[in-house]
Structure formats: C-alpha cells, structure tokens
C-alpha cells in the first residue's frame, strides 16, 4: 500500500455554532482577519457607523496555543475578557452579576468528534465554564438542529467558488427563525443582509469577489463561531496497484475524484 500525501488546497474548516444567548457577552476574539482592499473598504463604508472600527483597521489572527505557556496566556486573556463583561468565578463556577451560571451542551452526531471537543471542554472548565457534550443519533441531531434545540453544535458550511442565492439561507435574517434553514446561528443583522444581497445580485465577477470578501469580514468579526479544526489535505490509503493523475485539481472531494479518475496499473 502507499500513501497520498498531497491533496486539495480546499480549506476544510469545521466551526461549532453557538446557540446560547449569554455567550454573546463572552467577547472572545474568534475570527480571522486579513488586509482590507480598497474596493472592499468602499463597499463597507456606508455601514461604518454600524460596524466595529476594527473591521476597517486591524489585521486579526486567531490566538495559537504554542505549548503550555501559550495556552495559559490565552486562558488568562479569556478570563480578563469575561471579567470585563461581568462574569466572575464564584464557588468554582463562572457567573454573572445576577448569579446566572455559564454552562452549555455541545450536541454531536458523530462519536469521533468527542475526542476533538474534549480538550475544548477541559479548557473551558479552567475558566469556570461548565460545558459537556451529548452524542445522539443522526435523526435526532437533524431534528434538533432544524428546530434550533441546541446550545452548540459542530457543523461545516460548504462554499463554492461562485457564492450566490444559498448565502441568503446561510446568513440572512429572513432565514433566522425559519425551521430547517441553514442559518443555524440565527443571525439577524441588517448589515449582513445588505452584504448578502450584494453577493446575490453582483453584476460581475469582480463585484462578486469584493462583496464576498466584505461579507466574510463582517461575519468573522461577528464572532459567531469557534474555529474547530482544519486540514489542507485529504488522507487517503490506497493499494499500490492503483494510479492517479499527476496533476491534482485545485478543489475536489476525495471520493468522487478517485472513482472518476483513478485506474489500475497494468
């Protein structure tokens, strides 16, 4: 057998979705920011009064826990942010001034995700946050997701190279309270609505790219999601008798690509 080391450059992020109102006050820096282009700035300018100033000025990257010291530093920063929002540890539990405890459940449909969220749960406990996870069957998971009956779930939002009408279902306020919609976060933001419309009705490719970048920036700065995991490759074990094209496509799903293009060596 051999091992295919290189695969698509397609990003494969999975983001847990918060569904717990008190978490809005955590003010955790959970977004990725990059330089804002001239066209993107011009598109966002009419909404400046409704957006944080950092949207226009800062390049932001998520904190990296590089060893125990890095993790400790991140936890200390999180503790400071929580305290500034009125959350303090009392009797070993994080509470606000009204005595409301910060606790939530992560809903899972795949057993393998337990080992992924467990370190997250353990780190939250160091801040006095009581978090746990529950594994349910796929049917119940889908039902609870459709009806927004969850505190937090693990989910991925697949995107194409030409975003369009589907963005309305993902982010628009019209889909926020619609049962079964893809707006699992429940976003209701007039700026997001306006930018979604810019994407959907973009007159040309350049306008589409600018609108998509602007929407992406605003969504990330909204801190609706916690980046969960990422890998730039597909890990594929295969028999040495199989062969594949020397030039890989930029974007592809592993299984269909293998079925359609691989062959048996002669």
What is each residue range found by the language model?
Residues 120-131:
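Short alpha-helix C-terminal cap/hinge motif
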Residues 1-25:
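A glycine-/small-polar-enriched, mobile loop at the entrance of the PLP active site in fold-type I
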Residues 20-27, 114, 118:
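Short, surface-exposed alpha-helical segments at coil->helix boundaries
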Residues 31-62, 75-79, 112-122, 143-266:
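Detector for C-terminal structural segments
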Residues 90-96, 132-135, 211:
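Surface-exposed patches in mature extracellular/periplasmic domains of secreted proteins
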Residues 100-110, 131-134, 151:
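Short, well-ordered beta-strand elements
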Residues 72-105:
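Immediate post-signal peptide segment of exported/extracytoplasmic ligand-binding proteins
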Residues 133-143:
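Short helix-initiation/N-cap motifs at beta->coil->alpha
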């Amino acid at each position: 057998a051999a091992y295919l080391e290189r695969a698509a450059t397609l990003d494969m992020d999975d983001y847990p979705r918060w569904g717990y109102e008190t978490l809005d006050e955590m003010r955790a820096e959970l977004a990725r920011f990059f330089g804002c282009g001239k066209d993107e700035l011009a598109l966002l300018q009419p909404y400046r009064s409704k957006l944080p100033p950092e949207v226009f000025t800062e390049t932001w990257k998520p904190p990296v826990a590089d060893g125990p010291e890095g993790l400790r530093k991140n936890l200390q920063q999180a503790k400071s942010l929580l305290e500034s929002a009125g959350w303090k540890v009392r009797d070993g539990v994080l509470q606000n001034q009204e005595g409301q405890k910060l606790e939530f459940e992560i809903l899972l449909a795949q057993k393998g995700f337990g080992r992924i969220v467990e370190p997250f749960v353990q780190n939250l406990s160091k801040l006095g946050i009581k978090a746990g996870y529950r594994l349910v069957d796929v049917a119940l998971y889908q039902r609870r997701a459709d009806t927004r009956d969850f505190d937090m779930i693990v989910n991925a939002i697949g995107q194409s190279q030409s975003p369009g009408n589907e963005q309305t279902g993902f982010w628009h306020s019209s889909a926020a309270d619609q049962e079964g919609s893809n707006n699992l976060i429940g976003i209701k933001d007039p700026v997001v609505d306006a930018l979604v419309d810019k994407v959907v009705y973009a007159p040309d490719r350049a306008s589409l790219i600018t609108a998509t970048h602007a929407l992406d920036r605003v969504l990330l700065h909204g801190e609706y999601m916690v980046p969960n995991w990422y890998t730039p490759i597909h890990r594929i074990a295969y028999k040495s008798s199989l062969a594949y094209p020397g030039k890989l496509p930029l974007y592809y799903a592993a299984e269909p690509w293998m079925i359609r293009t691989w062959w048996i060596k002669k």
